[in-house]
Amino acid sequence: ILPLVGNLLNDLL
């Protein structure tokens, strides 16, 4: 789950 959240944030940034 953590890696998925990081991916989402990275996409926004």
UniProtKB/Swiss-Prot annotation:
Its main location: secreted. Expressed by the skin glands. Keywords: Amidation, Amphibian defense peptide, Antibiotic, Antimicrobial, Secreted. It is found in: Secreted. The modification Leucine amide is found at residue 13. GO terms for cellular component: extracellular region. One of its GO terms (biological process) is defense response to Gram-positive bacterium. Belongs to the frog skin active peptide (FSAP) family. Temporin subfamily. Antibacterial activity against the Gram-negative bacterium E.coli and the Gram-positive bacterium S.aureus. This is Temporin-1Ja.
